[in-house]
Amino acid sequence: MTTPRILYCNCTYAQVVPKEVKAAVLRKLCESGVEFEAVADLCEMSARKDAALHRLAEGGVVKIAACYPRAVKWLFAAANAPLPPAGTEVLNMRTQTADEITKALFSPEMKPNLPAGKASHNGAVVIESAIPNQPSPSL
């Protein structure tokens, strides 16, 4: 099994993640010696359609410490860099403790948790059909 990459978002501009949680997660990542990538703000990167999002989305399995899984999914999709649903686990620094997040980040187990549905090339939301052999409706 491939070791998941770790991505840490500092949520610098939105300032919606508790500072104590961000600081504790970052400190534990730095102290661990585990390789990780840190970005200032995924929201800002998405708004600029930063090419780094493509590299991050296409690099294999990834665990992301940021905010809500649905928000992270759509930030990447808005930049035309969709995350692989089966290879992405998002840890929510808005609702989870630093201990919960770092335990999950350091665990070799992947728990993919992106919500169902995907973005189409024209920006429409596509709902994945739960009925086999049935087309998915577009919104």
Functional labels for PLM-detected ranges:
Residues M1-L139:
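Iron-sulfur-associated redox domains of electron-transfer enzymes in respiratory
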